[in-house]
Amino acid sequence: MRAERLSPLLALGLLVAGIRSVHCLPENVVVKDRHRRVDGHTLASSNTDFAFSLYKQLALKNPNKNVMFSPLSVSMALAFLSLGARGPTLTEILEGLKFNLTEIQETQIHQGFQHLLQALNRPRNQLQLSVGNAMFVQEELKLLDKFIEDARVLYSSEAFPTNFRDPEAAKSLINDYVKNKTQGKIEELFKDLSPRTELVLVNYVYFKAQWKTRFDPKHTEQAEFHVSDNKTVEVPMMTLDLETPYFRDEELGCTLVELTYTSNDSALFILPDKGKMQDLEAKLTPEMLTRWRNSLQPRRIHELYLPKFSIKSNYELNDTLSQMGIKKIFTDADLSGITGTADLVVSQVVHGAALDVDEEGTEGAAATGIGIERTFLRIIVRVNRPFLIAVVLKDTQSIIFLGKVTNPSEA
């Protein structure tokens, strides 16, 4: 029997152009506060805050559509860029990432991402997870030695000389790299490149895991999914009887079900009551997520209905990030920490993601029965209307994937 699996694949690219070529546009980090431990957990709260802020912007710009992205990928790419930012540009990036610079220093932020990368890329028996960064640099562009070293040590970044004056060849080089790193799931991160491009920073994430309690493909049947009041589509609906963390939030009008993987990481499915999606989206905060996670209790769900879906997304984030307060990188940036001169601006930020829930993969382990509280109430959860999903890595509490499924039948 094959196990149902969840496979998010993600990539983000930051495209940096040189003002001088455009003419039309003008191993360890030493931190001062040695008593404060800086690791992946240090970033969790800020990253979650950034995740929900970005989600709200994308949902606003894409009403009644599927929304899929990796908060981790976007925040890591911007933090990577901030290595070369100076002055107000640096402050704007870090504050846009929801860091309180009166409480945490820049060096601590980079060290936190360094530890997070190391934690994410540790070998795992039950999980395929790969996270990384890369720089594609115009052949004659001279980068500062410190930037190259910091990029390598803190963000494990590879660097590739690239001829952007031949934009088609450069595009193929970058897209092929991302395609390879995401196991072929993201084929075209960049649809076009300008010959004036000087530098492209790329972050990618590949994640594949099997459910701890498997779905039986023989029980998957076509069923109705209510996209809206006046639109219904037929989708393959999986079904399962299991014991798993569950919470019914009467205050916000939603039902939460957490499904765990064999790696003990998890996917949190948030199903708003009919007509409650916008109210719920408006109230998404790190505090709300903490309340939900603390309220989840093991319950027997007699019938869980969950749609299969395969969704790809591609976003250009320039306007979105500007509305979130990260503006200077696109106009009057000071990225002098990259080359030593302030003549670079970011011309394009693109993000691609693909999320598959399907029947491939190996058999999952049996569900544990530790501390299960049985109830005589028969719980039935039908995920047959738009819902939210958050994939959370247990050891770092990082939201690696966040999205809204409005229509599972749309790729």
Swiss-Prot record:
InterPro entries documented for this protein: Serpin_CS (IPR023795), Serpin_dom (IPR023796), Serpin_fam (IPR000215), Serpin_sf (IPR036186), Serpin_sf_1 (IPR042178), Serpin_sf_2 (IPR042185)
Q: Which GO MF term does the entry hold, naming one?
A: serine-type endopeptidase inhibitor activity
Glycosylated positions are N100, N180, N230, N264, N318
Per the entry, what this protein does is: Serine protease inhibitor. Strongly inhibits elastase and trypsin stoichiometrically at the molar ratio of 1:1. Acts as a moderate inhibitor of plasmin and chymotrypsin. Does not inhibit thrombin, urokinase, kallikrein, tissue plasminogen activator, cathepsin G or the cysteine proteases papain, cathepsin B or cathepsin L.
The UniProt subunit note reads as follows: Homodimer.
Question: Could you say which residues form the signal peptide?
Answer: 1-24
Residues of the site described as Reactive bond: L377, R378
Give the family, as the similarity comment puts it: Belongs to the serpin family.
Q: Where does the record place it?
A: Cytoplasmic vesicle, Secretory vesicle, Chromaffin granule; Secreted
CDD domains the UniProt entry points to: serpinA3_A1AC
Protein's name according to its UniProt entry: Serpin A3-3
Q: Name one Pfam family in it.
A: Serpin
Cellular component annotations (GO), alphabetically ordered: chromaffin granule; cytoplasmic vesicle; extracellular space
Q: What is the protein's species of origin?
A: Bos taurus
Q: What are the UniProt keywords, alphabetically? A: Cytoplasmic vesicle, Glycoprotein, Protease inhibitor, Secreted, Serine protease inhibitor, Signal
